[in-house]
Structures are given as C-alpha cells and as structure tokens.
Amino acid sequence: MRLVVQRVTSASVKVEEEITGAINEGYMVLVGVTHEDTEEDVHYLADKLAHLRIFEDENGKMNHSLLDVKGSVLSVSQFTLYGDTRKGRRPNFMKAAKPDAANALYECFNKALREKGIHVETGRFGAMMDVSLTNSGPVTIWMDSKE
C-alpha cells in the first residue's frame, strides 16, 4: 500500500461538481493499493500516519502528529500510485489491485483512521475527481508499507 501525504491547511474533493469531502488542517492523502496488500498493510500505515510527526511545535520543529493537532484526513483513492513508467511513454498499471479488492482495503484504511479518533472525509472510489488543496510548507511525504 502506498500513500502520498500532503500537510494542508485546507483540502477538498469534488465529483461531478459536488463536494464529497472537505477538511481544514490535516492531511490530504492519496491512497494506492497493490495486489499483495492485506489488512496488515492497512493497519501499519494507518498507525504510522496517525502518529507521523510533521506538524511544527512552538519552536518550528516537526514534532506534532495529526492526533496532537486534532487534524483531519481527506482520503482519496489513487490507483496511479502504482503506475510503472520504466517502459514506453504510457504508464502500466498492472501492479494496482483490482477495483473490488482495492476498494475493500481503501475502506478498511479509512475505518482504521476513524477508529483512532481521526475525522476522515473521502472522495468517491473509482470516480473522476477534482482535488483542491493548500499545501502547508509545503510538506509532502511518500509512504509504502513494503519499503
């Protein structure tokens, strides 16, 4: 499972001109699922994300977690995180999980965050989405449960 985490002051996602999710301070997270992923990967990354210290303390050091600042998550499914660009000019997405399996693990990931007390807003799985955000810092982190 892969995540691209962006620290934001605000973020929202629209599907067909309807806002399906919006947050203020927190993380906008792109979530990608591959064939080998299990619930173990989900829980590992949900825990890591909840406790990742990339919010600044009073001294300007990245020392506070999402839980510390009571931030929210805008979670957006993103199969293209498994795009392979090594051959040709068009990405190959064969490493991305099939939609049914990916959606189940994506929903499990969001549930795991909610169980930690984190407010989670989402896009719509498999839909064409427009994501808007204000990246704070900017701070962008790549996380992979296998690496």
Curated annotation (Swiss-Prot):
Q: Which InterPro entries match?
A: Daa-tRNA_deacyls_DTD, DTD-like_sf
Tell me where in or outside the cell this protein is found: Cytoplasm
Renumbered to this chain, motif Gly-cisPro motif, important for rejection of L-amino acids spans 137-138
- Signal sequence segment: none
Alphabetic keyword roster: Cytoplasm, Hydrolase, RNA-binding, tRNA-binding
Give GO cellular component annotations, separated by semicolons. cytoplasm
SUPFAM superfamilies hit by this protein: DTD-like (SSF69500)
Q: Name one GO molecular function term.
A: tRNA binding
Catalytic activity line of the entry: glycyl-tRNA(Ala) + H2O = tRNA(Ala) + glycine + H(+); a D-aminoacyl-tRNA + H2O = a tRNA + a D-alpha-amino acid + H(+)
* Gene Ontology biological process terms, A to Z: D-amino acid catabolic process
User: So what EC number does this one have?
Assistant: 3.1.1.96
Q: What does the similarity note say?
A: Belongs to the DTD family.
Relate the assembly described in the record. Homodimer.
Q: What information about domains appears in the record's comments? A: A Gly-cisPro motif from one monomer fits into the active site of the other monomer to allow specific chiral rejection of L-amino acids.
Q: Function, please?
A: An aminoacyl-tRNA editing enzyme that deacylates mischarged D-aminoacyl-tRNAs. Also deacylates mischarged glycyl-tRNA(Ala), protecting cells against glycine mischarging by AlaRS. Acts via tRNA-based rather than protein-based catalysis; rejects L-amino acids rather than detecting D-amino acids in the active site. By recycling D-aminoacyl-tRNA to D-amino acids and free tRNA molecules, this enzyme counteracts the toxicity associated with the formation of D-aminoacyl-tRNA entities in vivo and helps enforce protein L-homochirality.
What the entry lists under PANTHER family is as follows: D-AMINOACYL-TRNA DEACYLASE 1, D-TYROSYL-TRNA TYR DEACYLASE
Q: What is this protein called?
A: D-aminoacyl-tRNA deacylase
Q: Which organism is this protein's natural source?
A: Bacillus pumilus (strain SAFR-032)
What's the encoding gene here? dtd
